[in-house]
């Protein structure tokens, strides 16, 4: 890419106008311009509109995230950890499935460092429900790392770590439709964990997320319900990418295989942050039903990703792995470990 940043920006826009994919270096340079506050909202909106029309690639996403990491506040998690997250934007307004699943997975032995924000398209994002539970979320890197070390669970509140992303906020809002930025959050956990369980709402983004994680060398499960849910679904089979050792295996899972009943998405409908916090507590306290079932499935995905895969990921029997992980997740709730961990998290978040 041209050395002058003005030329670099114009070069990238010209490429996008011709429907050409950007190189990783081009993508990083463009994001550096945005995060550095060097571009007007009109210029950023023009870039996002052109990029959305063309469609994104895994190489572009990797370049964008490279720049985000260069600007991110530091956090160091030395031990193996997993993030469990959905891209959002599925329009179903469910309870906070991945947040509840994170607590269950951590209480079952996975080390979880979750990255999230306030709601963008729903009534209650991860940050909103955690605040409603009484958890202090505005923590720096050393405080989050301390929690992960002490209780096996921590939350990176995105604005605390990716503050430069504020430069793109008004432009994104002015466009009024999803852009490539919508999948950057789930892929840019500042702790850079080794493992991920990520749900993807948009079909066109599904393989891109998988390829970014493959190229990163992560262990991951990336999934999308056939109903469009950005979680492992109860109302339809779920497509899943199993990622490990730089390889990707595509599979399909159906909860009925483990005796979990089909349930409509309406059975998972959430509400305000306070209402979702009440649902979360009830699930951790052992309430049965569809909400528990979907949390068990998604917690199992996080447990599997955390435990990792053999070198021959193509030989992995993902069905067997889910059978074992579902038992661990269920036991974590039924033993009281999950609800106890939540109370520890609330308490320790105010003490670190």
Each model region followed by its residue ranges:
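Active-site cofactor/substrate anionic-group-binding motifs, chiefly glycine-
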Residues: 55-116, 120
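Short beta-strand segments at enzyme active-site cores
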Residues: 43-44, 113-115, 222-223
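Short, small-residue-enriched loops and turns at beta-alpha junctions
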Residues: 34, 52-54, 88-92, 119-121, ...
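Glycine-rich anion-binding loops and their surrounding alpha/beta cores
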Residues: 3-8, 15, 22, 70-73, ...
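Active-site-proximal loop->helix
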Residues: 119-135
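N-terminal glycine-rich anion-binding loops that anchor highly charged ligand groups
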Residues: 3-7, 14-61, 66-77, 294, ...
């Amino acid at each position: 890419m041209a050395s002058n940043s003005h030329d670099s920006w114009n070069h990238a826009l010209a490429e996008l106008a011709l429907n050409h994919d950007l190189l990783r270096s081009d993508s990083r340079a463009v994001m550096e311009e945005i995060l550095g506050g060097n571009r007007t909202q009109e210029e950023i909106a023009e870039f996002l509109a052109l990029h959305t029309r063309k469609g994104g690639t895994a190489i572009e996403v990797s370049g964008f995230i490279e720049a985000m990491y260069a600007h991110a506040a530091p956090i160091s998690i030395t031990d193996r950890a997993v993030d469990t997250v959905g891209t959002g934007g599925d329009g179903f307004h469910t309870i906070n499935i991945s947040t509840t699943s994170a607590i269950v997975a951590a209480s079952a032995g996975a080390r979880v460092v979750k990255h999230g924000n306030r709601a963008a398209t729903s009534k209650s994002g991860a940050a909103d429900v955690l605040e409603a539970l009484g958890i202090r979320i505005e923590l720096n890197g050393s405080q989050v790392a301390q929690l992960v070390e002490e209780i096996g669970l921590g939350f990176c509140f995105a604005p605390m770590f990716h503050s430069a992303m504020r430069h793109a906020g008004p432009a994104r809002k002015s466009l009024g439709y999803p852009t490539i930025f919508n999948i950057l959050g789930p892929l840019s956990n500042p702790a850079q964990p080794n493992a991920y369980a990520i749900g993807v709402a948009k079909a066109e983004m599904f393989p891109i997320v998988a390829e970014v994680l493959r190229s990163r060398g992560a262990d991951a499960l990336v999934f999308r319900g056939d109903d469009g849910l950005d979680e492992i679904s109860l109302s339809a089979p779920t497509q899943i990418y199993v990622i490990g050792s730089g390889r990707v295996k595509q599979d399909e899972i159906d909860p009925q295989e483990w005796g979990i009943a089909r349930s409509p998405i309406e059975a998972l409908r959430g509400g305000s942050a306070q209402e979702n916090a009440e649902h979360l507590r009830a699930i951790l306290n052992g309430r049965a039903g569809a909400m528990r079932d979907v949390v068990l499935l998604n917690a199992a995905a996080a447990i599997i990703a955390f435990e990792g895969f053999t070198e021959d990921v193509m030989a992995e029997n993902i069905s067997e792995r889910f059978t074992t992980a579902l038992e661990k997740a269920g036991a974590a709730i039924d033993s009281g470990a999950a609800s106890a961990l939540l109370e520890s998290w609330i308490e320790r978040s105010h003490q670190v």
